[in-house]
Amino acid sequence: MIIGTGIDIVELERIQSMVEKHPRFVKKILTENEQEVFARLSRRRRLEYIAGRFAAKEAFVKAVGTGISAEYGWHDLEVLSDERGKPVLSVNLDATIHVSISHSQSYAIAQVILERLSS
């Protein structure tokens, strides 16, 4: 049974501006593991990566209905890729989390679907 859905879209230009104007932005948004991946990427891929993770985390908090808050902060949510490159969102929640991230030249978008198996 689907218990929540969320979607978020961000302009890459806006995220690039935040990264340039606020040196701590990357550390604020990304977990240590995400930062390690980020550091290994090309400049262009870094922008897509942080924008995609930003959008995925925003989509998740929309799906649970809380927004970024004390319950779910930026570092409570971690989005890494599995062995096939599929994004996996890790968080303490009793539900299956489906996440999809996509990029274009100007935007990053993410969708999260929360599913609970019937008991």
Curated annotation (Swiss-Prot):
Disulphide bridges, residue numbers: none
Biological process (GO), any one: lysine biosynthetic process via aminoadipic acid
Keyword line: Cytoplasm, Fatty acid biosynthesis, Fatty acid metabolism, Lipid biosynthesis, Lipid metabolism, Magnesium, Metal-binding, Transferase
Role summary: Transfers the 4'-phosphopantetheine moiety from coenzyme A to a Ser of acyl-carrier-protein.
Record-listed Mg(2+) binding positions: 8, 58
Cellular compartments per GO CC: cytosol
Top-rank taxon: Bacteria
HAMAP family per the UniProt record, alphabetical: AcpS (MF_00101)
Family: Belongs to the P-Pant transferase superfamily. AcpS family.
Annotated EC: 2.7.8.7
Protein's cellular compartments: Cytoplasm
Name by which UniProt lists this protein: Holo-[acyl-carrier-protein] synthase
Major location (coarse): cytoplasm
